[in-house]
């Protein structure tokens, strides 16, 4: 499922970047819980099979803040709250949340953004079929430097390559 895959890949990317062990754990947990705020979004919006209206987009864009409000008061999860809050920020500053730019976005949130996008692209959605890994990888490369941190994209591509070798040519 999305949360498990997100946590798995986020951990591998954080390790690939040689981040401290405690940070790796936080990033793994944040990746698993990044969409917890969707609990506060109407199901008909989440499951809608057609294009969202502007009003529905405004609603869906509240999920990182809702998630942060759920997670922040829980003492042992508090360190991951900013990662959840900022996982839809774009590297070039045009994402949503607070319009953070580049390194202003916590590295964990930048990792979650790449993993979340890749998993979303390679999974069936109510409004479209899953894209192939190859197409999703191309999309990540296209978004590198605008939507995504190029350093994170490169680390994730390395992780995917390692996973492919480990699994005899298949990406899990």
What are these regions (language model features)?
Residues 1-172:
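Metal-dependent catalytic cores of enzymes that make or break cyclic nucleotides
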């Amino acid at each position: 499922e999305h949360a498990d895959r997100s946590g798995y890949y986020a951990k591998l990317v954080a390790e690939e970047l040689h981040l401290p062990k405690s940070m790796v754990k936080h990033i793994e947990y944040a990746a698993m819980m990044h969409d917890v705020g969707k609990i506060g979004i109407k199901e008909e919006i989440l499951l809608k099979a057609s294009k969202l209206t502007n009003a529905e987009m405004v609603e869906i864009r509240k999920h990182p803040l809702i998630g942060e409000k759920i997670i922040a008061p829980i003492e042992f999860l508090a360190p991951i709250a900013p990662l959840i809050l900022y996982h839809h920020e774009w590297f070039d500053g045009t994402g949503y949340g607070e319009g953070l730019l580049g390194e202003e976005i916590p590295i964990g949130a930048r990792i979650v953004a790449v993993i979340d996008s890749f998993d979303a692209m390679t999974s069936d959605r109510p409004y479209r079929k899953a894209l192939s890994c190859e197409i999703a990888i191309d999309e990540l490369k296209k978004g590198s430097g605008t939507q995504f941190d190029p350093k994170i994209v490169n680390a994730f591509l390395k992780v995917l390559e390692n996973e492919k070798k480990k699994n005899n040519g298949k990406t899990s």
